Amino acid sequence: MLKIYNSLKREKQVFTPIEPNKVRMYVCGMTVYDYCHLGHARVMVVFDMVYRWLKASGYDVTYVRNITDIDDKIIKRAIENGETIQQLTNRFIAFMHEDADALGVQRPDYEPRATEYVPEMLDLIGKLEANGLAYQASDGDVNYAVRKFPGYGKLSGKSLDDLRAGERVEVDSAKQDPLDFVLWKHAKPGEPAWQSPWGDGRPGWHIECSAMSSKLLGQHFDIHGGGQDLQFPHHENEIAQSEGANCCNFVNYWMHNGFVRVDNEKMSKSLGNFFTIRTVLEQFDAEVVRFFILRAHYRSPLNYSDAHLDDARRSLDSLYFALRDVPPAAADIDWSNEFAGRFAAALNEDFDSHGAIAVLFELAAEVNRQKSAGLSCLLKGLGGVIGLLEREPSAYLQGGAGVGGLDEAAVGQMIVDRAAAKKAKNFAEADRIRDELKAAGIILDDSPQGTTWRRA
């Protein structure tokens, strides 16, 4: 029985889909004007794990993760670069896909771009206006009248009075209330614009997700996810828009992953501790990064540091050592097995990947103790459920080697030379070769079956 922590209700709830055995899930994706950073990596990996587990549990899942390809930052960056918005966004969408693929993130079923759904946005704004929840201001913008929606604040737990008193609200004399937010921005010279009943302009950020989700998943669907930073105001505003326009419940379960911190500080460009996925992957294997993200519960803060990534690498290495030393015939899962049952129980408890990975370590210990190929198959199979342990052990353990200028063939030849030196009892030469390989970031493992190597 799957339980999900529902941010809307502030408690874990048994998951009951709207339609039996079908799940419709929407996750807020990237704004594509720059490279993806570690915060994006966490969103991608966490909800990929959710997607995988829902499918493994037998659900027919429709997963939508949007792309924001029009907003102020995109326009500003395109102007700075002297290129079109399409050139900029297409380039960074391609980079985003490269990063996601490296991290083992499966493509969503739908990946809508905001600019492709402007008619749906206009339709939604029209409904809001007809329902008395939207108005055109003197500056030409169309705004949402927040105080006219009775349920505003139910996701974030913020009252309108608290927001007015405690939040930094942008002062805009054209708004009826400082808390109102823009649905349609009046066109400015040199900016992209679409025709609308309220004049040429472009959509506000919040209306984009309401329109895309309702078009692809319907007005009422099961799960909406995203980073904790989006809970307010973005997701709060989505609820106001969607429920205000369609007069029905919007989403049953809201999921939010925790923040990423760097050495216990908030990650930000101003602090100089801002890391893109690409920067991290120059130093660490992509599966290590995925493992690092999943080793923490998705709602917990995730503290990035080189030391924590090194520890994650050593931990993942140990799982691959078990698969290397007791090769599985194939990935196979017997769900009646005790380890498989506890693995499933962890993921059914609000997608507790931390607990599931703990079961993998217990299973690996049994693989090592019993030398059981059957348990090795189970280890590989369970790891694959959450996108881990899907490579050949040698490919993983030798990945990243060559930092000292040695390719795979050169390493193989040096191992042959070392074996010959040992056979000739030239132990000084054998030790010299081992030390040279170690200096190049390569560790040798001797066993009765021969010598294998891995990166340090």
Curated annotation (Swiss-Prot):
Zn(2+) binds at residues 28, 209, 234, 238. It is found in: Cytoplasm. InterPro entries: Cys-tRNA-ligase, Cys-tRNA-synt_Ia_DALR, Cys-tRNA/MSH_ligase, CysS_C, Rossmann-like_a/b/a_fold, tRNA-synt_1_cat_dom, tRNAsynth_Ia_anticodon-bd. One of its GO terms (molecular function) is cysteine-tRNA ligase activity. It is an enzyme of class 6 (ligase). Binds 1 zinc ion per subunit. It catalyses: tRNA(Cys) + L-cysteine + ATP = L-cysteinyl-tRNA(Cys) + AMP + diphosphate. Its EC number is 6.1.1.16. A motif ('KMSKS' region) lies at residues 266-270. GO terms for biological process: cysteinyl-tRNA aminoacylation. It comes from the Bacteria. Pfam families: CysS_C (PF23493), DALR_2 (PF09190), tRNA-synt_1e (PF01406). A motif ('HIGH' region) lies at residues 30-40. One of its GO terms (cellular component) is cytosol. Keywords: Aminoacyl-tRNA synthetase, ATP-binding, Cytoplasm, Ligase, Metal-binding, Nucleotide-binding, Protein biosynthesis, Zinc. Belongs to the class-I aminoacyl-tRNA synthetase family. Monomer. PANTHER family: CYSTEINE--TRNA LIGASE, CYTOPLASMIC, CYSTEINYL-TRNA SYNTHETASE. This is Cysteine--tRNA ligase. It comes from Dechloromonas aromatica (strain RCB).
